[in-house]
């Protein structure tokens, strides 16, 4: 899917890491929340409260989820899951466009 229809969008962006990671919250009609964002090259660490699905639409990054020993290369068209109450490290190698979906369990 290249777009979302009939959604509500927060006017203010979520800005992290001195503007190197920027996203906007969108809310679907079923009540679910997603963020659409862009990450510039660099290293980042995020913590999760809920389970997350990260879909990579363009670019390239390495990810290491808490508890993993090795980095995993993720490229355009790939995704990865992060458990709730966890964390993950990213090494963005090329500008990334992404969607993050949040789940209750």
Q: What residue spans do the PLM features occupy?
A:
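General beta-strand recognition
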Residues: 35, 45, 62, 89, ...
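A short, N-terminal "cap"/entry segment at the start of jelly-roll beta-barrel domains
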Residues: 1-31
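Conserved short histidine dyad/triad with adjacent acidic residue
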Residues: 27-49, 79-84
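Short, conserved beta-strand element in jelly-roll/cupin
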Residues: 48-63
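Residue-level recognition of conserved beta-strand positions in structured domain cores
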Residues: 38, 48, 65, 92, ...
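Short acidic-glycine-tyrosine-enriched beta hairpin
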Residues: 68-88
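Ligand-binding loop in jelly-roll beta-barrel domains
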Residues: 83-105
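Short loop/turn motifs at secondary-structure junctions and domain boundaries
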Residues: 17, 44-46, 64
């Amino acid at each position: 899917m290249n777009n979302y229809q009939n959604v509500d969008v927060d006017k203010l962006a979520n800005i992290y890491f001195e503007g190197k990671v920027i996203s906007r919250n969108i809310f679907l009609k079923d009540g679910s929340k997603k963020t659409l964002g862009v990450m510039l090259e660099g290293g980042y660490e995020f913590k999760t409260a809920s389970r997350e699905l990260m879909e990579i639409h363009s670019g390239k990054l390495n990810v290491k989820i808490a508890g993993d020993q090795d980095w995993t290369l993720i490229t355009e068209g790939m995704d990865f899951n992060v458990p709730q109450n966890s964390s993950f490290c990213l090494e963005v190698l090329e500008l990334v466009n992404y969607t993050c979906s949040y789940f209750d369990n």
